[in-house]
């Protein structure tokens, strides 16, 4: 299945949007792309939001029809992740699993915290730098449980099935064997990345341990079931999230016409990023 992107507006601007297309028609990045690319073989679709080594905080929006990828804002200003030495921007290709949702009404029995009201986050650790809106086929290896301001924010660790290392990586212990230091660096980055913005260090459940593949698959199934409840309108949050879709004809929010309302592609030159975003921050206590 081939997916393409439709960019509207200039990157690093409030108008920037990236829609996912299938057969040239916009679809929902949240609801229309199947979670499984090949369920029998454990292969998942991942929507890339943020390429590795970049700073713009891009995310699938929950508030607009067909859920394009936009840059997050705070008090009307675009948000960027700061550079925490020795890292530059995001440490991995960062994205989400479609057709998943971390339910803010349900407390996880082990983390003791509710979901963060977003699709399930994915960290793709392969060698290629991805692009915003890319739909990658990945296999999952493990998961970390970030506790972000009182919410469970799972971070699934996965690798592109076409990566040269993919055949050797089948569970979380293989990551340390073939990519020594990656899990430690990932843990450190998520602990400290908000400190330059004046926020406290993030905490992890399980003392920062990355859980194995079997545990991860259970988390994914739970989040897929939560999404099914959401898209069917049975969740209390169904009215707060845009559920418009173009493929799920048995849902009340199905719309065959939604794609025609999406603006035509309008790729403009990138807006400049303020030079202050280049600054390196040295965090006391980080490795």
Curated annotation (Swiss-Prot):
Gene Ontology cellular-component annotations: cytoplasm
Keywords: Cytoplasm, Hydrolase, Magnesium, Metal-binding
Chain residues that bind diphosphate: 79
Swiss-Prot/TrEMBL catalytic activity: diphosphate + H2O = 2 phosphate + H(+)
Residues annotated for Mg(2+) 2 binding in this entry: 121
Keyword Cell membrane: no
Predominant localisation class: cytoplasm
Pfam short name (any one): Pyrophosphatase
Cofactors (names): Mg(2+)
Leading EC class: hydrolase
Keyword Cytoplasm: yes
One of the record's GO molecular function terms: inorganic diphosphate phosphatase activity
GO term, biological process aspect, one: phosphate-containing compound metabolic process
Signal peptide: none
Positions of Mg(2+) 1 binding: 116, 121, 153
EC numbers for this chain: 3.6.1.1
InterPro entries on file: Pyrophosphatase (IPR008162), Pyrophosphatase_sf (IPR036649)
Compartment(s): Cytoplasm
Subunit-structure text: Homodimer.
Family in the record: Belongs to the PPase family.
Protein's name according to its UniProt entry: Inorganic pyrophosphatase
């Amino acid at each position: 299945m081939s997916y393409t992107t439709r960019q509207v507006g200039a990157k690093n601007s409030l108008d920037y949007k990236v829609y996912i297309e299938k057969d040239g028609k916009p679809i929902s990045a949240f609801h229309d792309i199947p979670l499984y690319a090949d369920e029998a073989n454990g292969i998942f679709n991942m929507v890339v939001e943020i390429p590795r080594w970049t700073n713009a905080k891009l995310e699938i929006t929950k508030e607009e029809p067909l859920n394009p990828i936009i840059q997050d804002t705070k008090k009307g200003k675009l948000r960027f992740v700061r550079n925490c030495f020795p890292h530059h921007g995001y440490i991995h290709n960062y994205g989400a699993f479609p057709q998943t949702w971390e339910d803010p009404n349900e407390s996880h029995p082990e983390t003791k915290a509710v979901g963060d009201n977003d699709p399930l986050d994915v960290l793709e650790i392969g060698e290629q730098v991805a692009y915003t809106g890319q739909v990658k086929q990945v296999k999952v290896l493990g998961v970390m449980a970030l506790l972000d301001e009182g919410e469970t924010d799972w971070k699934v660790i996965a690798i592109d099935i076409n990566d040269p290392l993919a055949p050797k990586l089948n569970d979380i212990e293989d990551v340390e064997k073939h990519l020594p230091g990656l899990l430690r660096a990932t843990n450190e980055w998520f602990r400290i990345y908000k400190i330059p913005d004046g926020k406290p260090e993030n905490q992890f459940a399980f003392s920062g341990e990355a859980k194995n593949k079997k545990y991860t698959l259970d988390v994914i199934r739970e989040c897929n079931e939560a999404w099914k409840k959401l898209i069917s309108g049975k969740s209390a949050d169904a009215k707060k999230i845009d559920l418009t879709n173009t493929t799920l004809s048995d849902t009340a929010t199905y719309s065959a016409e939604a794609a025609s309302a999406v603006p035509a592609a309008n790729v403009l030159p990138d807006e400049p990023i303020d030079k202050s975003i280049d600054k390196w921050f040295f965090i006391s206590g980080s490795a």
